């Protein structure tokens, strides 16, 4: 399985509202064990964990938009790269949409990483 495929599987798991196991996280994110816990904690609603993961795996990227959608009451997170490119739709490569802001941030992080894979 490629890293891109592993990231796609991890994104699907998180989008489904499920907590991924440590092996799934390890396959998708090549980060130290201590940082893998950020993924689990972000799925449970920790904004601190989502922020820590963002800083660890996407250095220099910023949160361009962090808002709640008034119609669906879900959260939209848009991340911008160092060059200033960003997405404006939750269907795009680096935007997360979810009823939990930390999980939405995690989805945006994972989609940004997925988009970077060739």
Residue ranges and their predicted role:
Residues 3-4, 10, 17:
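Extracellular receptor-binding modules and their adjoining Ser/Thr/Gly/Asp/Asn-rich linkers
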């Amino acid at each position: 399985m490629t890293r891109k495929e592993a990231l796609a599987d991890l994104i699907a798991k998180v989008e489904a509202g499920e907590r991924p196991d440590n092996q799934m996280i390890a396959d998708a994110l090549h980060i130290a064990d201590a940082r893998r816990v950020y993924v689990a904690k972000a799925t449970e609603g920790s904004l601190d964990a989502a922020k820590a993961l963002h800083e660890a795996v996407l250095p220099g990227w910023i949160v361009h938009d962090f808002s709640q959608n008034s119609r669906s009451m879900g959260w939209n997170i848009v991340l911008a790269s160092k060059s200033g490119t960003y997405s404006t739709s939750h269907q795009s490569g680096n935007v997360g949409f979810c009823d939990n802001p930390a999980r939405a941030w995690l989805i945006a992080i994972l989609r940004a990483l997925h988009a970077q894979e060739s």
